[in-house]
Amino acid sequence: MKELTHVDEKGVKMVEVGHKREVLRKAVAKGRIRLRPETIELIKAGKTKKGNVIATAQIAGILAVKKTPELIPLCHPIPLTGVDISFEFGEDYIEATCEVRATYKTGVEMEALMGVTLALLTIWDMVKAVEKDEQGQYPFTRIEGIHVVEKVKEEG
């Protein structure tokens, strides 16, 4: 059975990575936000009241990646070498992909997950006025399927 690395009989700790070699690390995470088809069309046409939804979501996602160790208590601050956030449109969804790269001693999965999550939350925030129903609820809107689709540790 695998053991937890951040918790032992003495309590909680940040894992020691000083002995590890710095190698290329990459992680890719994906997730989707379900939206009304009319909202998707507004975003594509650039006609949302709050501005450019996609550019704002990209910026938010990149910022989230950079802030990961401040928000997840036991994550190491990692010198990132690159972050890419992209989007693919479906009829009733937007799929976000966040790729994070670093040359360091520990992986960047949490950073990729944070980036995709905040990008999707930002989309929701920017379109909530048109997604609400008459009672102010969101019967169609949901974020789903956030997961790591690729993790790379280049052995050298």
Curated annotation (Swiss-Prot):
GO terms for biological process: Mo-molybdopterin cofactor biosynthetic process. Pfam families: MoaC (PF01967). The active site is at residue 125. CDD domains: MoaC_A. Its EC number is 4.6.1.17. It comes from the Archaea. Signal peptide: none annotated. Coiled coil: none annotated. One of its GO terms (molecular function) is cyclic pyranopterin monophosphate synthase activity. The gene is moaC. This is Probable cyclic pyranopterin monophosphate synthase. Catalyzes the conversion of (8S)-3',8-cyclo-7,8-dihydroguanosine 5'-triphosphate to cyclic pyranopterin monophosphate (cPMP). The keyword Nuclease does not apply. Substrate binds at residues 74-76, 110-111. It comes from Thermococcus onnurineus (strain NA1). Pathway: Cofactor biosynthesis; molybdopterin biosynthesis. Belongs to the MoaC family. HAMAP family: MoaC_A. Keywords: Lyase, Molybdenum cofactor biosynthesis. Homohexamer; trimer of dimers. It catalyses: (8S)-3',8-cyclo-7,8-dihydroguanosine 5'-triphosphate = cyclic pyranopterin phosphate + diphosphate.
